């Protein structure tokens, strides 16, 4: 009998397949996105050094909005883009984290693009 994979297992497998191809550098870091039920998180990662350069989330103290809806995701995208531009980072590689490019993930990407990130 076949055993059905749960959603989180399938997402992790998709993420691993994508991570084989996507790699962030100091000049063009990886914009990694994670979506939980209540919040959304985004960070720019330099995979060569293994360090996070910039991070933003809906769980931060100064966040005005709700992290579980599209408007909140767009705000997080704008927040991470503003922090990246302050550090002189304009070009990034988008890593959707195994999530479908739809809904909150798509809104975060559009918010980051509107604020000035190029991907």
Curated annotation (Swiss-Prot):
The keyword Ribosomal protein applies. GO terms for biological process: translation. The keyword Membrane does not apply. Keywords: Ribonucleoprotein, Ribosomal protein, RNA-binding, rRNA-binding. GO terms for molecular function: 5S rRNA binding; structural constituent of ribosome. Pfam families: Ribosomal_L18p. CDD domains: Ribosomal_L18_L5e (cd00432). It comes from the Bacteria. One of its GO terms (cellular component) is cytosolic large ribosomal subunit. This is one of the proteins that bind and probably mediate the attachment of the 5S RNA into the large ribosomal subunit, where it forms part of the central protuberance. Part of the 50S ribosomal subunit; part of the 5S rRNA/L5/L18/L25 subcomplex. Contacts the 5S and 23S rRNAs. Belongs to the universal ribosomal protein uL18 family. HAMAP family: Ribosomal_uL18_B. This is Large ribosomal subunit protein uL18.
């Amino acid at each position: 009998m076949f055993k059905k994979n749960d959603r989180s297992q399938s997402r992790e497998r998709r993420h691993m397949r994508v991570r084989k191809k996507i790699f962030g550098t100091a000049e063009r870091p990886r914009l990694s996105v994670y979506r939980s039920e209540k919040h959304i998180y985004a960070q720019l990662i330099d995979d060569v050094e293994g360090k996070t350069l910039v991070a933003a989330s809906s769980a931060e103290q100064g966040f005005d909005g709700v992290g579980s809806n599209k408007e909140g995701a767009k705000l997080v995208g704008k927040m991470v883009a503003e922090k990246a531009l302050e550090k002189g980072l304009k070009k990034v590689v988008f890593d959707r984290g195994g999530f479908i490019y739809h809904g909150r993930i798509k809104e975060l990407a559009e918010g980051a693009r509107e604020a000035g990130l190029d991907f």
